[in-house]
């Protein structure tokens, strides 16, 4: 009703951009006739204009003024370099991002290309732009692919990857545009604020940031703070004992009601992800461990037992983690990717290692931490893009002050979303999924099946293998991760079946008929690897659809070849390469391989180096390197031959209905379901989607409550018969909304608590940066000393008492504790002075004593006082900050209980946290001044 009266606010927003789009189109006509060099000079012209402005506001208004022409320049460069022209709706997306908003753009609408527009415009300031992706693979791909446009226009493009050394990182951060993942940016920020020297800092001041898949980073990952930790010593034997003990404990089936424990040793709350021992469980555990009290401070066991229970019940192998090389590696619940190097904190990871009988790594202590919310709020200007933001619009607005604008699609969406099929049992659901997959596959349509865990993907793989359906598996298992790009490249081919764990953030569009460009790259790599790549790295041939896979809980048939039958092989969609190359092309490729061996050496390249050469050759950027030129010609030759077959395949796939997407479980968030649906019907293509669910699915089981339990009893239908019910659909939507609200509250709470830490963190980090910059260190230390003198006077002088009753003897002895050079100071020297005069007198004495100390030290070691000042301030700041982080963690745990005493835990946390921070800063100042006066540089050795 209100929309009709007032108009849709999103439409009103979009109308503002239409005149700007017209301006870009007018500029585009003027640029057509320019040479490449003339087009490139526009960059330096823009930059020279920006150099003349003096304030940030002036700079921003000039950028707005330059926007139409700058966008037209990027569009023209993209046409020349990539052969891709930004659509008008993509220009609108770029304008939304430049204004510091979130652009919601559907899958396949070219978000990656959109990011080039605001990135180029804002990089003209020379202060750096960060383009953030969810994983290293996407950062690398975008830097190579979209970076061509920026390099063509004369801008430098950087890439930060997990394996890079600090010097390399620094060089890449100094580029005009830097591609990186959210975690690399966050960890580099924390490491920079632990640096002992200015030369170790790799990042510049933040300016403008574009986040791809912004909902994944700012919403999904916001529950997990970034933590840098150091090792602490704790008994590893206790983890093993606790793991053995909990195996003998029995889980309670019911939950406690009215304070009465259920039968069993412990309760599990899957919603809160917690395990609680019952009274009976406490008694049994103490008996099994042969201890009197699990909470005994001298011999604490409760922490170990709780973690062991959570490891047993809530952390599931092949769902939450996989075991690889004697390690438990976390699987990201949103993207389905493994996260090597990341560990659960507070002893939880050690409990999982004990459960799996792996080597137990030492426990860690937090050295530095920040949440993604507070990290990204450090950027003066922040923007993001995603296919699904509208459902989280309120959170973006409240937490990040980011508005969301829905950008229209270039073509009308033709996708059909079929009605959900709900089954009573999980087993029936999986049989139905396998049947629909096989049926659609038989029609020659590609099928993408989204699963929620490694375990479930392998279960479906086994069911499809039994039905002789060739398929590819894309999950967190290392052997599958390595094949990710290959698998996605062929996922749109006729009859292709792809099982993928959580497609969120996969970043690669599924092209109907297959991706000829990527297949050509794979082919050239296959040909060149055997001749050019180092023997120890070997070459893994491109993957073909599998029929048999190893699967947990299923018996593997021995001696069965994984390759498909001859009958199936004849179907074009079953091979990674659509057609054998002609003899002429084969001969040219063999000749090229021999030539490159002479140029680059026999088996002398790493696999990554060869990838780099191939990626550069696949670009359209001008190059003088003759080897790259020849590689480029070879890739085009292969691509042309593949294109002939694949274009026909694309026509056939469109004719039979396009890509079919199957969801096998509702995610906790409707947004992630929409992301999976969005894989079908990209850019106006035909496509369809369907979700298969069961009443035993986690979402309904944990959050559906008693209503779903009642439904299970009410539906007296066959197991394999799908259920359709309005009440069931409402229960499902209600459960999802309940989960979204629940997790939003968790993120809000994390943000509110970290906001307290954030102000303290900013104060500590700015103090550190000032020290590293070496600005007026002496004045800073003297300032610390003067504050200490004031605090001593405040502690020992009570103005309510007459001066003769002031405890000047103790005051003087306290001053001497800090400044031993004032050994001649006597209480009688202070007689007759009022409180303020006392402070001024002691401050003056401190300054004189510090000058004496400096003169004495500098005489034998010139310049060492500044080094000592820097060392002691950093040492004290870092040590006390580390201890403070632990104290704040303990405080956070303890204030939670105060809610029972009608006190707001957050206010208690703020007040006590503030007092603790002030105390920390007081201790830091006192320790520094004490250390500086006690400092005795080592005597230089005099050679005989």
UniProtKB/Swiss-Prot annotation:
The keyword Thylakoid applies. It is a peripheral membrane protein. Residues 533-565 are annotated as: Disordered. It is found in: Cell inner membrane; Cellular thylakoid membrane; Cytoplasm. ATP binds at residues 90, 108-112, 509. One of its GO terms (cellular component) is cell envelope Sec protein transport complex. GO terms for biological process: intracellular protein transmembrane transport; protein import; protein targeting; protein transport by the Sec complex. Disulfide bonds: none annotated. Gene3D superfamilies: Helical scaffold and wing domains of SecA, P-loop containing nucleotide triphosphate hydrolases, SecA, preprotein cross-linking domain. Belongs to the SecA family. HAMAP family: SecA. NCBIfam families: secA. This is Protein translocase subunit SecA. It comes from Prochlorococcus marinus (strain NATL1A). The gene is secA.
